[in-house]
Amino acid sequence: MSNEKTSTKAPKFTYSSKKKFCVFCSEKIDYIDYKNVERLKRFMTEKGKIIPRRISGNCARHQRQLSTAIKRARYMALLPYVVK
């Protein structure tokens, strides 16, 4: 009798997605302005949440600036906190 165990797990499939890139780095934007509402809306969901970095493809530096700019725009009532 053999003590060998057979593997019953299915092989893991990996998928390769397109390499995401930072929009702000490619356009050489150093400062994200909170008054540019149209640009900020592109990085928000329909419900008004900030899209995370792993989905948007932003670098860490620009994602921090983006979230600060969105929060400032919300405080100044340029963007809504919640969309119903």
UniProtKB/Swiss-Prot annotation:
It comes from the Bacteria. One of its GO terms (molecular function) is structural constituent of ribosome. Pfam families: Ribosomal_S18. Keywords: Ribonucleoprotein, Ribosomal protein, RNA-binding, rRNA-binding. Part of the 30S ribosomal subunit. Forms a tight heterodimer with protein bS6. Belongs to the bacterial ribosomal protein bS18 family. Binds as a heterodimer with protein bS6 to the central domain of the 16S rRNA, where it helps stabilize the platform of the 30S subunit. This is Small ribosomal subunit protein bS18.
